[in-house]
Regions:
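Alpha/beta-hydrolase active-site loop
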Residues: 55-78
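Glycine-rich phosphate-binding loop signature in dinucleotide/nucleotide-binding domains
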Residues: 2-3, 77-82
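Glycine-rich His-Gly loop
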Residues: 10-14, 89, 112
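Short, surface-exposed "cap/lid" segments of acyl-processing enzymes
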Residues: 3-49
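N-terminal beta-loop-helix "entrance" segment that forms/cooperates
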Residues: 42-62
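Gly/Ala-rich beta-loop-alpha elbow adjacent to hydrolase catalytic centers
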Residues: 86-91, 95
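Active-site signature of alpha/beta-hydrolase-fold catalytic machinery across serine-
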Residues: 23, 97-98
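Flexible "cap/lid" loop of the alpha/beta hydrolase fold
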Residues: 103-140
């Protein structure tokens, strides 16, 4: 696939800060791309500050997936060209939704959350989601 697009948007998952994309941002900028790494709504702060505030932040706690999707949809539609989007985990699901809606030129989902209705029974997947979903007795901590 050939694309002349020169803008990349990096979308993080739910449990990390957008700062995790720093090395990717540098890499793609050195290759001549314009790189945007917009944080999720209510997550634009240093990691230490987020760790202290998010478990009790009512704005973040009341946010729904539709709000996050709308946030990124507004970003991609405000650009002069359709960007390439790369997302990890829940960010990968957001990428799939943006691709499905025809809002981006290309999308790459890294270790993506699967779309609704698709579930893997592979032990590695089941084990990975049990703790964040609070399905295990020792999984009651916030992330």
């Amino acid at each position: 696939m050939t694309t002349t697009n020169k803008t990349i948007i990096l979308i993080t998952g739910a449990f990390v800060s957008h700062s995790i994309w720093h090395n990717w941002e540098i890499y793609f900028r050195e290759k001549g791309f314009t790189v945007l790494v917009p944080p999720w709504p209510h997550k634009d702060a240093p990691v230490a500050e987020l760790r202290n505030s998010l478990p009790n932040n009512p704005s973040f706690a009341s946010m729904r997936l539709a709000d996050v999707i709308a946030h990124y949809e507004n970003i991609v539609t405000s650009l002069p060209e359709k960007p390439i989007v790369i997302g990890h985990s829940l960010g990968g699901l957001i990428v799939q939704i943006l691709v499905n809606r025809g809002l981006v030129s290309a999308g790459i989902a890294l270790h993506s959350v699967p779309p609704k209705g698709i579930f893997s029974f592979e032990w590695s997947f089941v084990k990975a989601i049990m703790k964040p979903l609070g399905l295990l007795p020792f999984g009651k901590k916030t992330y």
